[in-house]
Regions:
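Core catalytic lobe of class I
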Residues: 2-302
Length: 303
């Protein structure tokens, strides 16, 4: 397949057209399966209400779009993690096939189901190398006030008893980046693999000199701080900072190598690859996002 290209289509099918062992790095912000939008609903449960609901949520169009809650706990909620595992299994083997031996694969995954992604990729043949924590500078946080709920019900006794308590999660100020590696030939070493395939290590010198390396924390920490700039907002609901993608690309590849993003959204991975003189292949299902990607890459070329 031609590099420096954007394929508008179904990733699970289109990746079959990529040559085996032709990619040096896969870097992708895959759907998290948490019903962020219609493209992120990867389960058959249309009445998911794991954390309960409120009258305001019932009226909200976003909850209707997500197939979200109508009544308390649903038995179908229990199937969502395994359904996410099954979805990851539909593409994991193809990812393994197209990567060079010893090549890295970085996957942005949601905290709730990341373990299912790990299992699917291990079952496909990947080695789970590490989990990097991306520490964000800000994150939306919605937690229902228990006291207010009881007050609306006219239950003042429990409203007083549970003052200060919330429903929901803590503020999500980190996101997991799962680091996988394609196994290298048995009997050899990673150093042998670097000589043969030019992948398998990480660039410590780059890491030490990069501003994302945490001051005050041991060099080459697996906690990465990266702020989201204004340029990294507004194109996609799950948009990631270009600087973060550049960091991961520089960490594991050299100029001229091929970067693949099978779920490229608004194209931040491809923009980062272009900035760093890497070849790239991006696959995206939504034609509107494919247009945005083309415009971003063209704008960078003109600049």
């Amino acid at each position: 397949m031609k590099t420096n290209s954007i394929i508008c289509g179904n990733s699970i099918e289109e990746i079959k057209n990529i040559d085996s062992e032709s990619v040096h790095l896969i870097l992708s912000d895959i759907p998290y399966g948490i019903s962020l939008d219609t493209w992120d609903i990867l389960h058959n449960n249309t009445n998911s209400s794991l954390l309960g609901t409120s009258p305001a949520q019932k009226k909200s169009s976003v909850f209707k779009k997500r197939g979200k809650p109508l009544n308390g706990w649903s038995e179908a909620d229990k199937n969502m993690p395994i359904e996410y595992y099954n979805w990851c299994s539909t593409w994991a083997e193809e990812w393994l096939r197209v990567l060079k031996p010893g090549a890295s694969c970085f996957v942005f995954a949601g905290r709730r189901f990341s373990h299912r992604c790990i299992c699917a990729m291990e079952d496909a043949g990947f080695i789970f190398k590490d989990m990097i924590a991306w520490e964000k500078d800000a994150a939306a946080h919605r937690a229902q006030n228990v006291k207010v709920v009881f007050e609306r019900r006219g239950d003042n006794e429990n409203a007083t008893k549970w003052k200060g308590w919330k429903l929901g999660n803590l503020r999500p100020l980190f996101e997991p980046i799962l680091w996988f590696m394609k196994p290298y030939p048995i009997g050899g070493t990673l150093t042998d693999n670097i000589r043969l395939h030019s992948v398998g290590g990480y660039n410590e010198e780059y890491f030490k000199n990069n501003p994302l390396n945490n001051s005050g924390i041991e060099v080459c920490s697996n906690i990465i701080k990266c702020k989201t700039s204004q340029d990294d907002r507004g194109l996609h609901p799950a948009q990631k900072p270009v600087a973060l993608m550049e960091f991961l690309i520089n960490l594991t590849t050299v100029e001229g190598q091929v970067i693949l993003d099978p779920f490229c959204g608004c194209g931040s991975t491809l923009v980062a690859a272009q900035n760093l003189n890497r070849e790239y292949i991006g696959i995206e299902l939504n034609p509107e996002y494919c247009k945005i990607i083309s415009e971003r890459l063209e704008e960078k070329t003109k600049a």
